[in-house]
Amino acid sequence: MKYTQEAIVIPVESITSMPNMPPCILGLMNWRSRIIWSIDLPEMLNLESLDTRLHQYNAIIIRVESVLLGLIVQEIIGTVRFMPDLIRSPVGQVASSLVPYLRGCVMQEKEILLLLDARAIVQSSILHND
């Protein structure tokens, strides 16, 4: 929650695609009069891609220091705070390709909730041509 600024729903047309970008970078969008990159988070994490037939996107705006990103996701169900003692290592629980982008995971009944590491997402080599 420390890095989350807002969860919003935006029309697909509000994202302007940019040429020669990795597939996970959808393009640029306007958020509160600021131009920010929109990222297809499932694509970036090698998960199931967004439904291309959508008319609107669910976006989670994150800020890490001075960097703002719009993380586009399939669905936003809500937010939950967890006690630190409930957070477990994701190693062995999820695909190894996801681990660098996670702070941990929480086991809840029949599902594993993944806690994203916003700093790791922003600093990902996938998003930078350095």
PLM ranges: what are they?
Residues M1-D130:
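An acidic, low-aromatic, low-complexity terminal/linker signal
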